């Protein structure tokens, strides 16, 4: 990938990095185990971001 990226693409990638986290333990505790997994989790090799 190019080292110099357009600003829009860079911002989208930064947002994707922030979204790609597990559910915090305090959320699991607060919801009583109803919320365990994050449906928006993305693996870098299995599914790619839109360009």
Swiss-Prot record:
InterPro entries named in the record? Ribosomal_eL39, Ribosomal_eL39_CS, Ribosomal_eL39_dom_sf
What one GO molecular function would you report for this record?
structural constituent of ribosome
Q: Which PROSITE patterns match?
A: RIBOSOMAL_L39E
Q: Which GO terms describe its biological process?
A: translation
Please give an example of a GO cellular component term from this record. ribonucleoprotein complex
Q: Which Pfam families match?
A: Ribosomal_L39
Q: Keywords on this record?
A: Ribonucleoprotein, Ribosomal protein
* Organism domain of life: Archaea
Q: Which SUPFAM superfamilies match?
A: Ribosomal protein L39e
- Provide the family line: Belongs to the eukaryotic ribosomal protein eL39 family.
The protein's name in its UniProt record: Large ribosomal subunit protein eL39
* UniProt source species: Methanopyrus kandleri (strain AV19 / DSM 6324 / JCM 9639 / NBRC 100938)
Gene name for this UniProt entry: rpl39e
